[in-house]
Amino acid sequence: MNSPASVAPILPDTIFRAYDIRGVVEDTLNAETAYWIGRAIGSESLAQNEPNVSVGRDGRLSGPELVQQLIQGLHDSGCHVSDVGLVPTPALYYAANVLAGKTGVMLTGSHNPKDYNGFKIVIAGDTLANEQIQALHERIKTNNLTSQKGSITQVNILDRYFKQIKDDIVMARKLKVVVDCGNGAAGVIAPQLIEALGCEVISLFAEVDGNFPNHHPDPGKLENLQDLIAKVKETGADLGLAFDGDGDRVGVVTNAGNVVYPDRLLMLFALDVLKRNPGADIIFDVKCTRRLTPLISEHGGRPVMWKTGHSLIKKEMKKSGALLAGEMSGHIFFKERWFGFDDGIYSAARLLEILSQEPANAEDLFETFPNDISTPEINIKVTDVTKFSIIEALEKDAQWGDAKLTTIDGVRVDYPKGWGLVRASNTTPVLVLRFEAETQAELERIQGVFHAELKKVAPDLDLPF
């Protein structure tokens, strides 16, 4: 393989983002970019005394070419690369926990459109975010890069990952499960693993295909769950599971075909973990239901609200020693019995274990948890500059009335019977809003307050409520 030029080209600022590096292939990201990113990651890892790096890729069409250059860049910086091949992201995180090195790079476009690709990066056990990602860009710009000969070894991590989950999960009875991999990377393991746990599996779209010919692999959007819902109803299954493109998130559908939102899934997991670990910290992001806090407290846990973003949640988990965390986006992180990284496949297995021990079906079980009326996530298009200035203005000047304010990530306003949130997305030029309340009238009242305060600081905003 020919190494590119000795000095890096200028790389676009836009690809170096809050939780990862991501861009459009052949526009802002190409094989040369991947090489230099490999050089930067390798140099940073070596600076932290970690010469061993695991590398994986998802099923995107650009994957084979980009991963080859990424690995070459790591090799040329002097790192010893374990190439684990086409795997879901959690299997790469697993490799970075159980192989010699604690550095791992996953080449994945996650749930972005098919022409995207990107890099999720762990260096010496720490998932990179914000200024750490900017520092990689800085290394490339200033040519602060090591140059030595490393090595490359092919490693089969999937069998080991498969076995460890299979050995950890104990099923009390057989369940019938529909598994929709959306032609993403989870297809190489999820249906086989769930079958090995003792379930009857009805598999949808398990063939890895970066064209995503059936539906987009993003279970966070209702339109992508329609095939799963229909199949669950048609087959009388106990549960439906949908994985995102790289398998670090899972979507859940009950036997009645109703979607279980991730914050409600976290309620079930929290109760399960707290049974064995009274007093444990449970972390959730600012987008989650207000019903989580009292539920965790009542069952002897310590609820911790934190910023949105898989990298930021993992850092906070490490700091606090929390045993479980979850995000409204569907990332669930188990430290109890697992490694503390977000893993849609392991989370699905834990859900099956709990369900197999319950006499109630999934629909009835989730019905027992408190529920409010809530909106889906509302995205308001702004610019990458104004999204932050609007939030700053709200923090400074807004009048919210009698409420509890949380400003760790945007502005969350909790009233006695409901709440609203507005925050700047870290990944796109939008404001993210969400509302929840006991009654429709209270929901509309809270939306009215947000509408008025947003219009005060940004009169031109086009608000759908």
UniProtKB/Swiss-Prot annotation:
Pathway: Nucleotide-sugar biosynthesis; GDP-alpha-D-mannose biosynthesis; alpha-D-mannose 1-phosphate from D-fructose 6-phosphate: step 2/2; Bacterial outer membrane biogenesis; lipopolysaccharide biosynthesis. Its cofactor is Mg(2+). Substrate binds at residues 327, 329, 331. It comes from the Bacteria. Mg(2+) binds at residues 110, 244, 246, 248. Binds 1 Mg(2+) ion per subunit. It catalyses: alpha-D-mannose 1-phosphate = D-mannose 6-phosphate; alpha-D-glucose 1-phosphate = alpha-D-glucose 6-phosphate. It is an enzyme of class 5 (isomerase). GO terms for molecular function: magnesium ion binding; phosphoglucomutase activity; phosphomannomutase activity. The active site is at residue 110. The record marks 423 as: Interacts with the biphosphorylated intermediate. Monomer. The phosphomannomutase activity produces a precursor for alginate polymerization. The alginate layer causes a mucoid phenotype and provides a protective barrier against host immune defenses and antibiotics. Also involved in core-LPS biosynthesis due to its phosphoglucomutase activity. Essential for biofilm production. This is Phosphomannomutase/phosphoglucomutase. It comes from Pseudomonas syringae pv. tomato (strain ATCC BAA-871 / DC3000).
